[in-house]
């Protein structure tokens, strides 16, 4: 299993509201090997985003397990969860909604770097470099989400995901 970097095993997600329940994901399994690309395809509302959110711990898992490099991360907490975030990043469909409107885009990109203990000066350098790699001028670091277009915000979201050099 050394070349498998991500494994989802019989994932299930049930949302409960009062006495009603709705199964969003039912028995999904897959493996992602080093160097592979994986596409999850389906109709609107079929559970694609929910699967990604379960893998990244943004949504709880009702049943099943997730393994990262052979380690069960299904119930990861604290330090283990922070390490997981360094290996797996997600770019949201609606990037504008994933940024704090009170913070600059540079703050949003640099948050994970600062959480890793990187100095503000070094964080700023990395943020500017990431923006340029994603086709935006470094001055976008000082803008707020409402000051950029949807496409520009998507590029900023990609820069944020790349900030910690994730494997996935």
What are the residue ranges of the model-derived segments?
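Conserved ABC ATPase signature
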Residues: 144-148, 152
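Helix-to-loop junction immediately C-terminal to a conserved catalytic motif
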Residues: 56
């Amino acid at each position: 299993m050394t070349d498998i970097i991500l494994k989802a095993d019989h994932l299930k997600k049930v949302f409960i509201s009062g006495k009603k329940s709705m199964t969003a994901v039912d028995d999904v399994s897959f493996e992602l090997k080093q160097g592979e690309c994986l596409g999850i395809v389906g109709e609107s509302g079929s559970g694609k985003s929910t699967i990604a959110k379960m893998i990244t711990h943004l949504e709880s898992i009702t049943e099943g397990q997730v393994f990262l490099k052979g380690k069960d991360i299904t119930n990861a907490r604290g330090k283990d969860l922070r390490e997981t975030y360094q290996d797996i990043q997600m770019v949201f469909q609606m990037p504008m909604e994933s940024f704090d409107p009170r913070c600059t885009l540079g703050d949003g990109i640099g948050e994970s770097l600062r959480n890793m203990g990187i100095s503000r000066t070094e964080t700023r350098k990395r943020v500017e470099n990431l923006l340029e790699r994603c086709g935006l001028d470094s001055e976008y670091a000082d803008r707020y989400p409402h000051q950029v277009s949807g496409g520009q915000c998507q590029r900023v979201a990609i820069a944020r995901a790349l900030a910690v050099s994730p494997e996935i």
